[in-house]
Curated annotation (Swiss-Prot):
Chain ranges of the PE domain: 1-93
Gene that this sequence comes from: PE_PGRS24
InterPro entries assigned to the protein according to its UniProt record, in alphabetical order: PE-PGRS_N, PGRS_rpt
Taxonomy, superkingdom: Bacteria
Name recorded for this polypeptide: Uncharacterized PE-PGRS family protein PE_PGRS24
Protein family membership: Belongs to the mycobacterial PE family. PGRS subfamily.
Keyword set includes Cytoplasm: no
Any Pfam family hit: PGRS
């Protein structure tokens, strides 16, 4: 029994390539015939004549060998071509009976149900918005939906049968006003197969771009389809939602949301699509990115991440906010990052919030700086799992002449835990070139048993005239047991940002969170340290954050220590920052009924 598999098309192409190689070698040998076999002597002496005769003899010998090789090559190509033709003829002869057999198998279901038993569905005709045909009941992919005529929605993709992928949705038609929506992706196979991608929205020439089509859902096993991109327009169209992953799928996530459409001339970029949910056990899909804003348009908001599976699964990451560009005198505004998706009911982490979009400064002299988008909120954790981290704030760029600074976006808040788990960390504030940097996000609250999330660090002020962002407050351990989250550090800048306060501990047990350190000040005072968090009934108060240093001005004040409650020591005060005059140290926290007071910070 032979296990050899041949591809006739590949063999035919190889035979053609071999023939071309032979022709090329033959032309090269013919061109070399005269120069190599008819050499002239360099002089009239006998030595020159002997040398010329020797090299001419070598050339003639080479031509003789080349002639034999050419004959062998021609015979080999002829044999190879005949073999390729034999394979092609055999395949054609074998395919005809099989096609007839397939038609016999498919005819009953085609007549009764309007779809074959085995085979792919037909694609919808372009420009009609026709739906893609359904795939075979047993095996086959759904057909792609046809694109829409001007102003007409794209056709939905065809559904698969038991095994196969759903067809992609058709593109929405362009419109003189609003663009038409893209078609939805077809459903994946009932047993196995991924959902089809949603079609992109059409262009809205004077209005809003078309909505992206939603991705198709999977059956029992498979990934959800990706949402279609929103169409461009004065306002960009929203991206389509991602499809749900298979009900029992473990590895593949829900489909990602589609990207929001581009916006022009003062509109707003489209919002990214929501990520698809997990089935019972898989992760949610990522949210789509917000649309880009051009010529004074704001960037679109990122899409929300999809929720994790019903029983277990992590939430999807929120989409990144779109970039906003300025017009001649007004800076652009970045879109907000999308919220992270929530985890499943039993196990899983909340999704990370999306990063805020960048705000670009105005291109003309005298214009304003851009404004970065706010970072997305972290998703909530499951009963057993942490909350998601907040997204980073967007960057605020200065104007083209560097006279006006941008504003950095605030970091997103961390997601909350539920039963057992820590709160998510707050996102870092966005940086700014010559303006105010964004503040850090607040840490998420812990579960019934779990620590609060750390506060996000304040953004950095990069050049003179900038203000460092304040650190975010640490999250509280809102349940029975757990430590408070540490406060975020204040950002660096000409004027420094203050550190965030530490979070409070759980009711029964836990230490208070430490306060965040103040930022470094270049021309202004150093930032003040954050206050330490309060302890639980058993636990120590959090230490105060150190005051920030200053290059030419006063050091920042240290944060006060947190108080203990019943059994525990008070937190130590933070040290004052170094500067032309040192900052004052923070006061120590008070002890519980059993414990010691915290030490004051050094000045």
């Amino acid at each position: 029994m032979s296990f050899v598999i041949a591809a006739p098309e590949t063999l035919v192409r190889a035979a053609s390539d071999l023939a071309n190689i032979g022709s090329t070698l033959g032309a090269a040998n013919a061109a070399a015939l005269g120069p190599t076999t008819e050499l002239l002597a360099a002089g009239a002496d006998e030595v020159s004549a002997a040398i010329a005769s020797l090299f001419a003899a070598h050339g003639q010998a080479y031509q003789a060998v080349s002639a034999q090789m050419s004959a062998f090559h021609a015979q080999f190509v002829q044999t190879f071509t005949a073999g390729a033709g034999a394979y092609a003829s055999a395949e054609a002869a074998a395919a005809a009976p099989l096609e007839g057999l397939l038609n016999i198998v498919n005819t009953p279901t085609q007549l009764l149900l309007g779809r074959p038993l085995i085979g792919n569905g037909a694609n919808g005709a372009p420009g009609t918005g026709q739906a893609g045909g359904a795939g075979g009941l047993l095996y086959g992919n759904g057909g792609a939906g046809g694109s829409g005529a001007p102003g007409q929605a794209g056709g939905p993709g065809g559904a698969a049968g038991l095994f196969g992928n759903g067809g992609a949705g058709g593109a929405g038609g362009d419109g003189p006003g609003n663009g038409a929506a893209g078609g939805a992706g077809g459903a994946g196979g009932l047993l196995f197969g991924s959902g089809g991608a949603g079609g992109p929205g059409g262009v809205g020439n004077t209005g809003t771009g078309g909505l992206g089509g939603d991705g198709g859902a999977a059956g029992l096993f498979g990934a959800g389809g990706i949402g279609g991109a929103g169409g461009p327009g004065f306002n960009g169209g929203a991206g389509g939602a991602g499809g749900r992953s298979g009900l029992f799928e473990v590895l593949a996530a829900g489909g990602a949301g589609g990207t929001g459409g581009l916006s022009v001339n003062g509109g707003t970029g489209g919002t990214g699509g929501t990520g698809g949910g997990g089935g019972l056990f898989s992760n949610g899909g990522a949210g789509g990115a917000g649309g880009f804003g051009v010529s004074g348009s704001a960037g679109g908001n990122g899409g929300t991440g999809g929720d994790g599976g019903i029983f277990t699964g992590n939430g999807g990451t929120g989409g990144t906010g779109g970039t906003g560009t300025g017009n001649q005198l007004v800076g652009g505004e970045g879109g907000a990052g999308g919220a992270g998706g929530n985890a499943g009911i039993l196990f899983g982490a909340g999704g990370i919030g999306g990063t805020g979009g960048t705000g670009l400064g105005a291109p003309d002299p005298g214009g304003t700086g851009g404004k970065g988008g706010v970072g997305g909120i972290g998703g909530a954790g499951a009963l057993f799992g942490p909350g998601g981290a907040g997204g980073t704030g967007g960057f605020g760029a200065s104007s083209a002449d560097q006279m006006a600074g941008g504003i950095g976006g605030s970091g997103g808040s961390g997601g909350a835990a539920k039963l057992i788990g820590d709160g998510g960390a707050g996102g870092t504030g966005g940086d700014s070139v010559r303006g105010a940097a964004g503040s850090g996000g607040t840490g998420g609250t812990g579960g019934l048993i779990g620590d609060g999330g750390a506060g996000g660090a304040g953004g950095t002020g990069i050049e003179f005239g900038s203000v460092g962002g304040a650190g975010g407050a640490g999250g509280n351990a809102a349940g029975l047991s757990g430590a408070g989250g540490a406060g975020g550090a204040g950002g660096f800048g000409e004027t420094a940002g203050d550190g965030g306060a530490g979070g409070n501990a759980g009711l029964l047990n836990g230490d208070g969170g430490a306060g965040g350190a103040g930022g470094l000040g270049i021309a202004g005072d150093g930032g003040n340290g954050g206050k330490g968090g309060k302890a639980g009934m058993v636990g120590n108060g959090g230490d105060g954050g150190a005051g920030g240093a200053s290059v030419v001005a006063n050091g920042g004040v240290g944060g006060s220590g947190g108080n203990a409650t019943l059994i525990g020591n008070g937190g130590n005060g933070g040290n004052g920052g170094v500067g032309s005059a040192p900052g004052k140290g923070g006061a120590g926290g008070t002890a519980g009924l059993l414990g010691l007071n915290g030490s004051p910070g050094l000045s």
